[in-house]
Regions:
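N-terminal secretory signal peptides that target proteins for export/translocation
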Residues: 1-15
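Short strand->helix junction
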Residues: 11, 67, 273-275, 425-427
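Bacterial N-terminal signal peptides
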Residues: 19-31
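Periplasmic polypeptide-binding modules associated with outer-membrane biogenesis and secretion
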Residues: 35-118, 130, 145-163, 192, ...
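Gram-negative/organellar outer-membrane beta-barrel architecture
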Residues: 102-254, 262, 329-339, 351, ...
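C-terminal outer-membrane beta-barrel translocator/porin domains of Gram-negative envelope proteins
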Residues: 115, 243-372, 376-387, 391-393, ...
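A short alpha/beta connector and helix-capping loop motif
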Residues: 390-407
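Extended hydrophobic
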Residues: 411
């Protein structure tokens, strides 16, 4: 639940009605408080209010002009305002003919701005800037993230409001922009996207989302010597609406990490891209994680990631910017975007992919008094199938790749670090290896 605004605070009701100033003021008028030293003010002024309307602060506990107040009654107003829970401090200060209500509000709009520097084998070294704030809009969380290096440029924004429809349905809006131009690719791509979605959590462990949005994306700057398939797939842009459906379920409760218990998580995403055009696509993605305990400090992690993209009407072909090309962190031991059909040295990706992993992990935090997880793993998978093989000139068949390696995850200060060393033992001609992989991030 996001923090609530001041106007959601109950007004002078129930038990603390006796502390509100209205009955106190009436009592003073009836008994002639002014004759006993009460002071009347011509005006009431609020100081220090940032987000709460000054009129609300005055009237919530009955601080009004023209009414005589004893000192004890001014203290009662302070107690009444403090009891609302939205102020850190409240002080009523007589200043001549003006009663000053000096307040300091509790921060109901917590947020942060941070710069970051991160490295991932997939994207390289990236500088970032992140901003988030709760109640950026009334009862609405908002965030903005920017990332940049010469090959990767990204920007994203998000608005999220809970309990839009009853107490179960939330509303979100996502905006995104990305331009990628990697040195190891013969092309560049750009995507602009906006989506509005509803989220429903039938339980604390299950989440369902349904979204509708609009996307514009393009494939450009294809090298002259690139694969003829890439040249034919070049496009100045496809702009069209899309639909998204998602289901996430996890046996893990918030704060649990999968050690010492048998747990799992599963996620399904279904996209329908480019609706209303000749390039309409179905894009299905699946992921699962299973944690099998091998004692309190050891476990087996079994994972599967898979996906398939295909034409909705069976007539149009996918493009490289639609297809899957796992590698680096998503398929350890192989270079980024490297697994799948190739032509003329270019990675083309496949319409279908699947990567599974079995990893034995040990938790060594108790030995070194710091977060430390080490493991040994075997990854295996493939990416295959094209709509156009240039007259069977391109081999798009299923060819399994496999690798074995060691992984390590720890923290340096507050910066998480994960790395692996892997060696492919089942590969195809033309595959590029990546023996060492690293991911780290630090914020300041």
């Amino acid at each position: 639940m996001l923090p609530q605004y001041f106007w959601s605070v109950p007004r002078c009701a129930g038990g603390f009605l006796r502390r509100c100033i209205v009955p106190c003021a009436v009592f003073s008028l009836v008994t002639g408080a002014s004759a006993q030293g009460g002071q009347t003010f011509d005006t009431v002024e609020v100081q220090g209010a940032e987000f709460i309307p000054e009129h609300d602060i005055q009237m919530t506990c009955g601080a009004v002009a023209g009414v005589p107040y004893l000192t004890i009654e001014l203290r009662a107003i302070e107690d009444c305002l403090m009891s609302t829970g939205v102020f850190e401090t409240v002080k009523l200060i007589p200043n001549g003919e003006t009663l000053v209500i000096a307040v300091k509000e509790v921060n109901t709009r917590p947020g942060r701005i941070e710069a970051s520097l991160s490295y991932a084998s997939q994207d390289g070294l990236i500088g970032g800037l992140f901003f988030e704030r709760y109640n950026l809009l009334p009862d609405t969380y908002g965030s903005v993230r920017l990332e940049y290096n010469p090959e990767v440029k990204r920007g994203s924004g998000r608005l999220y409001r809970t309990d839009v429809l009853g107490s179960d349905i939330d509303l979100g809006v996502k905006l995104g922009w990305e331009e990628l131009s990697f040195d190891d690719s013969s092309y560049s791509k750009e995507t602009k996207q906006i989506e509005t979605y509803l989220a429903w959590m039938p339980s604390q462990k299950t989440r369902v989302e349904m979204g509708v949005g609009y996307r514009d994306y393009r494939l450009f700057d294809v090298d002259d010597g690139a694969s003829a398939l890439l040249v034919s797939e070049q496009t100045a842009g496809i702009s069209a609406p899309f639909l998204r459906f998602a289901l996430k379920h996890s046996s893990l409760s918030e704060g649990e990490n999968g050690w010492g218990t048998w747990d799992y998580s599963v996620g399904i995403d279904q996209y329908f891209w480019n609706l209303g055009t000749d390039d309409s696509l179905s894009d299905f993605r699946f992921e699962s994680r299973s944690y099998v305990p091998l004692g309190q400090m050891w476990r087996m992690l079994v994972s599967l990631d898979a996906g398939r993209v295909s034409s909705l009407d069976g007539n149009n072909a996918t493009r490289v910017i639609d297809r899957f090309a796992p590698g680096a962190g998503s398929f350890r031991g192989f270079a980024p975007r490297g697994v799948g059909p190739h032509d003329n040295g270019d990675a083309l990706g496949g319409n279908t992919f699947a990567v599974s992993s079995i990893e034995i992990q040990g938790n060594f935090e108790g030995l070194v008094n710091a977060p430390l997880v080490g493991g040994v793993f075997v990854d295996t998978g493939a990416s295959w199938a094209l709509d156009d093989t240039l007259g069977r000139a391109i081999d798009d068949g299923f060819h399994r790749r496999s690798s074995v390696g060691l992984s390590l995850a720890f923290e340096v200060g507050r910066a998480p670090v994960s790395l692996f060393v892997a060696k492919p033992f089942d590969k195809q001609d033309g595959d590029k290896e990546q023996v060492f992989g690293l991911r780290l991030s630090t914020a300041f």
